[in-house]
Amino acid sequence: MSTADRNQAGIYWQSRMGNNADGIGGNCHRYDIVTTDAQGQPVRGRLVVDYGIKIHNGGGAYDCSFPSPEALFARRGQPDPAHAPDALLLTHSHEDHLGALKHAIDMGYRLPPIHCAPFTAELVRKSLTSAGIIETDRRPEIHIVKPNETIMAGGAEVTFVPVDHLPGASALVIRTKEAAVFHSGDYKFDKTMALGDRADPELLRRIGKQGIDMVVSDSTAAGEERPKVSEREIGKHLQTIVAGQQGRAVVAGVLGTQLDRVVSLGRAAKASGRTLVVSGASLVQNIAAAERAGHSLEKAIGAPILLTKDARDLPADRALVVTTGAFAQPMAGLTRSADHQPGALYIGRDTTVIIPQRAIPPVAEAHRQMVERLDATGARVITAERAEEMGYGAIHQSGHAIASDTRLLYTLLKPRQVASPIHGAPGQIEANAEIARSVGIKPLVLRDNGAVVRVTSHGVDIVGREDLPRIGARETGDVKQLPRAKPGEGRRPRPPAIYRYDQLDSTGERIQSRNIEPYAGPARTPRPPRDLRVR
């Protein structure tokens, strides 16, 4: 589709990736803003919302895939293409929403200015640094946006509205004189979460009264009709579990960005006279990033957090050690312990392992195998499923809107035109659409990516469609050669991997071109990864 197809005034929305038949991930959306000047001529702006990866599991051809940057960003050293994006807006800091940034840069693209919340900005910087993108001229500008702040970007007013998901998570209200779109990002409603600003239903009601033409909303858990469990209730159930482990070591495995759950575990530790100990570089870095962004876990817990190196003299039954690995990621702490890897936390018959997170489909098999290996150590393993079977109650709740949350969002916003479900496979999208119908809102159901949707105050129409290629990325086995750190810069990250990039079709099933030349700098022979874990 040419830019001529976007000449009429309105907001043009396109899902570049995220509505995938093969599972959630790679979330990215393009918004073209078309207004008219005093002479009635079109004035164009462009926004990109999120740029994430889709993780591939199970030994396939690629480690991850993401939307092709070719039609989104400008290449370094080349003039800006017509209508290059004015801004990149990030809703939050999960990899499926920002993990492709480093890959686009390594492929030779220049990113537009990024606008996001403070914690999101911290994790963007961490992601780029860990990928070896340390040169200032390769890193994008990052502009911090405060909760409920409105910025001008691409010819639109964009308001970052706090939602409940993780620190700094934001929905976006994109408004022009022609139309208004509410882009939910990942969200749910839980006023008991400890970190960051909470979603405000009354604020959302006021936003709806100001006029919203289309709601673009998260579908991940829209089909779940089970009763919702708050983080406060999860915390109480964790307290009961931990209180019953007298004389035993307790180790909990979480996701690296699941910091509200870390707070709940910390409160459970405090209630039982234990000290929270954090193990694993990624989790330690994320907690420090949250602190810099104004989200203090120690303040929320009401007790200090120790690193493993500072807890050597702490008796095992007076600690609660939290590490990564809830999704059985290969290098995460809990996975390494299950595999008895050198330097990993010891888990044995006198250990209770708590995994307060349900496995999602892409990692279900790896998670099952990890739990089996933990069981084989003789440890007492309490997964989210087992906790309910044992009568403790729920210790996990989806971070995404379940059916009742989805219904509440639509009831508060009351879009004038349509609701369009995103961030889901076809079944999840249809469940979201059915909820919209049930409250009298017309759904616009797009079961795949590529449709171009024009939004105005008079109507919403599909005005075209594009086939959108993906990029498949796989580590080559080589690593980047980084220059020595200058005084005051701190230690360089471990040598980052160099990736091979292939262009795939819109389904990710067929290769269109191989070995797209990346920008990676000189390579050197890989060396074994340094063990970051403290015994």
Which residue ranges define each predicted feature?
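Non-Sec secretion/translocation targeting segments of pathogen effectors
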Residues: 524-535
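Ser/Thr- (and often Asn-) enriched beta-sheet segments in non-cytosolic proteins
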Residues: 42-44, 141-143, 150-152, 157-159, ...
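Hard-cation-handling environments
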Residues: 223-361, 368-392, 398-521
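Histidine-centered active-site/metal-ligand motif
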Residues: 92-97, 165, 183, 392-403, ...
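Generic N-terminal simple sequence motifs
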Residues: 38, 522-525
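His/Asp/Glu-rich metal-coordinating catalytic cores
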Residues: 2-89, 94-271, 275-309, 336-341, ...
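Intrinsically disordered, low-complexity segments
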Residues: 1-2, 511
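Extended hydrophobic/Leu-rich segments
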Residues: 11-13, 33-35, 72, 468, ...
